[in-house]
């Protein structure tokens, strides 16, 4: 969620390839800017040609689309609501997102040209963090845990059938957020709170059973994202004090630091070819202030 307004959003290329035990002190590579506004939560399309992202317009978080080179921007939403957590359908024909207005948060879908917006999740739920199943028939999402004490209580993970609107509870008990299904549809990665001072990346079977802790670290960690081939998971965590982006194997082994950033780096997203990770980096701890959209090429990583 991004509730503030910032003035500058940039893409920064970082050439990194380091293990957690040998993190560099300065990012490598030359930084350059493509956009100059509030731009966060960028998600590349399945074909890698377009990027959906969020920009603040007159105090509202609106959805935008641009080409992967930063050109050809179009505004998708223009209503008096906030729009968060965009996610492409596997065929690139729909974009899901959170539509927040008048105290409600529902999962909605829209065409990439900005037409055909439809709310699909129940208004009785405060829905967040939608992601599509590989077959494009369902959307996973969670309920609002508010992320701020003492409001942490229950956040369940659901699947909704896009055609029938039927909702199935997959994971319950505690605070479970950021669900995303593996490319082969066999597993769900998600973030689970462990008390008030720790969160971990978990993985469960596709029906929500057999949850197991992958990160097992005393830090706050979450925001999981599967690599296109399903062999690795990117995530964000503050195990090095500041929130940074890491990559691990799908079994939780071989954790590597992707980008040595300052501030709060979260919401990693893989490029369709698996060679880059996009993420949002906020220079302040609270979301939405001085946030940059960044991309880290992984050519030199030990895969």
Where are these regions (language model features)?
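Bacterial N-terminal signal peptides
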Residues: 7-17
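Sequence signature of WD/YWTD-type beta-propeller architectures
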Residues: 21-303
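Positively charged n-region of N-terminal signal peptides that target proteins for export
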Residues: 1-7
């Amino acid at each position: 969620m991004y509730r503030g307004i910032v003035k500058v959003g940039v893409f920064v290329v970082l050439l990194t390839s380091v293990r957690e035990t040998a993190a560099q002190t300065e990012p490598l590579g030359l930084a350059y800017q493509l956009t100059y506004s509030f731009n966060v939560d960028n998600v590349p399309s399945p074909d890698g040609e377009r990027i959906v992202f969020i920009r603040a317009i007159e105090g509202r978080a609106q959805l935008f689309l641009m080409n992967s080179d930063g050109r050809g921007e179009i505004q998708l939403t223009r209503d008096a609501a906030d729009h968060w957590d965009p996610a492409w359908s596997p065929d690139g024909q729909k974009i899901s997102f959170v539509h927040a207005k008048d105290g409600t948060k529902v999962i909605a879908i829209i065409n990439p040209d900005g037409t055909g917006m439809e709310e699909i999740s129940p208004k009785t739920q405060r829905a967040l963090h939608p992601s599509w199943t590989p077959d494009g028939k369902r959307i996973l999402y969670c309920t609002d845990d508010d992320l701020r004490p003492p409001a942490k209580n229950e956040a369940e993970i659901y699947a909704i059938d896009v055609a029938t609107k039927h909702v199935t509870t997959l994971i319950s008990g505690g605070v479970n957020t950021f669900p995303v299904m593996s490319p082969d549809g066999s597993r769900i990665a998600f973030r689970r709170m462990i008390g008030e001072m720790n969160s971990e990346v978990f993985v469960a079977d596709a029906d929500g059973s057999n949850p197991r802790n992958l990160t097992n670290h005393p830090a706050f960690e979450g925001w999981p994202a599967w690599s296109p081939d399903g062999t690795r998971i990117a995530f964000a965590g503050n195990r090095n004090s500041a929130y940074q982006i890491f990559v691990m194997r799908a079994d939780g082994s071989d954790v590597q630091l992707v980008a040595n950033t300052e501030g709060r780096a979260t919401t990693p997203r893989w490029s369709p070819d698996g060679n880059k990770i996009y993420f949002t980096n906020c220079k302040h701890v609270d979301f939405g202030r001085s946030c940059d959209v960044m991309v880290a090429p992984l050519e030199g990583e030990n895969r």
